[in-house]
Amino acid sequence: MAVVTMKQLLDSGTHFGHQTRRWNPKMKRFIFTDRNGIYIIDLQQTLTYIDKAYEFVKETVAHGGTVLFVGTKKQAQESIAAEATRVGMPYVNQRWLGGMLTNFTTVHKRLLRLKELEAMEQTGGFEGRTKKEILMLTREMTKLDRTLGGIRDMAKVPSAVWVVDTNKEHLAVAEARKLNIPVIAILDTNCDPDLVDYPIPGNDDAIRSAALLTKVVASAVAEGVQARAGLSSDKDAKPEAGAGEPLAEWEQELLSQAAPAAEAAPAAEAQAAPAAEAPAAEAPSTEA
């Protein structure tokens, strides 16, 4: 079964690029044609590259890796947060702070400070302080949560980064490349494909397009989690370092939802078989 269909891509407007005067010549090979001054992206190539990116993300997570979701533009903020949260991955959908990857040691200290402030608030640590002190601590906590809340549980730099709009997120892309972290990203017609390891040619400005492709990456993460727990149908996958790590609560929940569905299918077939063999009841005669 295809990861995503051509119709879904068309319906979400993934094929629309930028105006012909706003483009990167390196993207020429991904362009199908132009209509009324707008480039049309070759969705056949998009489907091919989606499969490659999907497989990479799935294998990365299956072997214990994490994927950082990045998208701070207005069109991507909601889907980035929703999909990353759905699969328990870290995300950045507000402002990218310089050094978030290359200076992660300092960022991690700020994360510890955020957790410290939250613990103080929950355990009554603010009691006995002046109103001004409480206000300052609350403001600090709110600011940290807004900028770092999406990566609060990220204990180390990610194994890969998913990016919506590489031009806007050029700092994130540059830091990932500096640390040799693979970059998976939507490539619009004004982007540089040389900066991305796993490109997906598509529209990074439309809300539905960004949401669809982000959902595809999140689904690959979910499948990787299941593979890590041994539920994958691929029995030939070789375990790597990190594959035996204990699963987090969100991963256990994801797997608990997948297991009953897998068990229900054989049971339904077993019930259907006797029903098919039983003779059909004769309809009562309508004759007088």
Curated annotation (Swiss-Prot):
It holds the Pfam family Ribosomal_S2. GO terms for molecular function: structural constituent of ribosome. The keyword Ribonucleoprotein applies. PROSITE patterns: RIBOSOMAL_S2_1. Gene3D superfamilies: Glucose-6-phosphate isomerase like protein, domain 1 (3.40.50.10490), Helix hairpin bin (1.10.287.610). Residues 228-288 are annotated as: Disordered. InterPro entries: Ribosomal_uS2 (IPR001865), Ribosomal_uS2_bac/mit/plastid (IPR005706), Ribosomal_uS2_CS (IPR018130), Ribosomal_uS2_flav_dom_sf (IPR023591). This is Small ribosomal subunit protein uS2. It comes from Rhodococcus opacus (strain B4). The lineage of its organism: Bacteria, Bacillati, Actinomycetota, Actinomycetes, Mycobacteriales. The gene is rpsB.
